[in-house]
Regions:
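Iron-associated oxidoreductase/ferritin-like identity signal
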Residues: 1-97
Length: 97
């Protein structure tokens, strides 16, 4: 699986690649946590527990957003793609050049 670790010898990887890997793995974990909390919220019958789970899920979304921003600042191509696709009302598939 993609989250299990490096696919190349770590000694062959630059510090920048290792840091980006760390950020990407962290982002994957945050998004996985959002998914798990969504499922827990749907299944939860106790109103007060459901409120806590919703709060926790939304915190994970904040963490994911912070990681996306870090990646954007470090990767100019990713930044360009985010600029093209985010915060627009154009159909998602109409962005191709």
């Amino acid at each position: 699986m993609a989250h299990e670790g490096y696919h190349e010898p770590i000694e062959d990887l630059s510090a920048e690649t290792r840091e980006m890997h760390r950020a990407i793995i962290s982002l994957m974990e945050e998004l996985e946590a959002v998914d798990w909390y969504n499922q827990r919220v749907d299944a939860c019958k106790d109103t007060s527990l459901k409120e806590i789970l919703i709060h926790n899920r939304d915190e994970e979304k904040e963490h994911a957003a912070m990681l996306i921003e870090w990646i954007r600042r470090k990767d100019s191509i990713f930044a360009k793609e985010l600029k093209d696709y985010l915060f627009t009302d154009k159909p998602i598939t109409d962005h191709h050049e």
